[in-house]
Amino acid sequence: MKAGATSMWASCCGLLNEVMGTGAVRGQQSGFAGGTGPFRFTPNSDFSAYPPASAEGPNIVCKACGLSFSVFRKKHVCCDCKKDFCSVCSVLQENLRRCSTCHLLQETAFQRPQLMRLKVKDLRQYLILRNIPIDTCREKEDLVDLVLCHHRLGSEDDLDTSSLNSSRSQTSSFFTHSFFSNYTAPSATASSFQGELMGGDRTLGSGALAQEPSEIASANTEDDEDDDDDDDDDDDDDEENLEDRTPGLTKKRVRASLSDLSSLEDVEGMSVRQLKEILARNFVNYSGCCEKWELVEKVNRLYKENEENQKSYGERLQLQDEEDDSLCRICMDAVIDCVLLECGHMVTCTKCGKRMSECPICRQYVVRAVHVFKS
């Protein structure tokens, strides 16, 4: 009974599957999956049901603070370094936008004493914004020299562009004047021809009218020549100023020494390079020093030891002079303890005095050498 019920249930399930078409659907699904059915489907790697993600553009940020630009942080381009900065990190001066770093160095007028007072961070940032390598710079003075060199090169480029513009203005003025001269000549001839036909009065009037444009053209050429001469003089002055500045860089810098210090207060005002030069000159090792105050302590100790050595050396010289004054002038070994009679000079010891026949100072005959005792 139980087996018959099971077979009936299985046949009912098979009939239901045939009616609903589950087998055909399964066959089609297997055909799609395996690629062997009536509809062969080959997946394409280039096709996607979703649209491609839009490529995000480069995120432009401020070079100083690193924040992206927005409505409240508008983008501005520095007129010196040509980099992008926000309104907070840039300064508006004389209708020109400069970043804070360029503005800071512009305030120093690129003078060496003023640049030495700036921070190393600002000098490095100024050079990095201009894509100038600073790998070889070890001291602050190297950065200052590099900034001054780059500034002078930029001024030379400005001079070249100004001279190019002046030459272009000269050529344009030349072509303009030649055009006007060629243009006024036919009018002058026509007016003179009409004057001959109309009479003598018309001839004089037309001649005056013909002379006026030529006088104006000649006056313009003279003014342009004067302007060109002034530009040439300015260029010569700028070149002389550059020549005066360049020998200062070519001069050999004098190394710092311990004799340059007059007191311990002068040590604080010296740069790191000068401190290292003093230590190296006096054979002091500073390889473990990472901060400036460590170098200052070493130089202070060196200065104190040098002062003590000079004092002790002076005392030793004084004692040596005193000892030399009390030694016998003949043997330079024993102490002077003898007086020579009759002259009374004390220049020898008793042993040498008894051997002397005459005084070595006054050449008087020695009668007797008397031994004396110092109290």
UniProtKB/Swiss-Prot annotation:
Start-end of Acidic residues biased regions: 221-242
GO CC, any one term: cytosol
SUPFAM superfamilies to which the protein is assigned, alphabetical: FYVE/PHD zinc finger, RING/U-box, SAP domain
Lineage: Eukaryota, Metazoa, Chordata, Craniata, Vertebrata
Protein location: Cell membrane; Endomembrane system; Nucleus; Nucleus speckle
Chain positions of all zinc fingers (RING-type): 328-363
PTM summary: Autoubiquitinated (in vitro). Proteolytically cleaved by caspases upon induction of apoptosis by TNF.
Protein name: E3 ubiquitin-protein ligase RNF34
Complex and partners: Interacts with CASP8 and CASP10. Interacts with p53/TP53; involved in p53/TP53 ubiquitination. Interacts (via RING-type zinc finger) with MDM2; the interaction stabilizes MDM2. Interacts (via RING-type zinc finger) with PPARGC1A. Interacts with NOD1.
Residue intervals of the SAP domain: 115-134, 267-281
Molecular function in Gene Ontology: phosphatidylinositol phosphate binding; ubiquitin protein ligase activity; zinc ion binding
Gene: RNF34
Domain notes: The RING-type zinc finger is required for the ubiquitination of target proteins.
Annotated membrane topology: Peripheral membrane protein
SMART domains found in the cross-reference section: RING (SM00184)
Pathways involved: Protein modification; protein ubiquitination
Keywords (A to Z) from UniProt: Apoptosis, Cell membrane, Cytoplasm, Membrane, Metal-binding, Nucleus, Phosphoprotein, Repeat, Transferase, Ubl conjugation, Ubl conjugation pathway, Zinc, Zinc-finger
Enzyme Commission code: 2.3.2.27
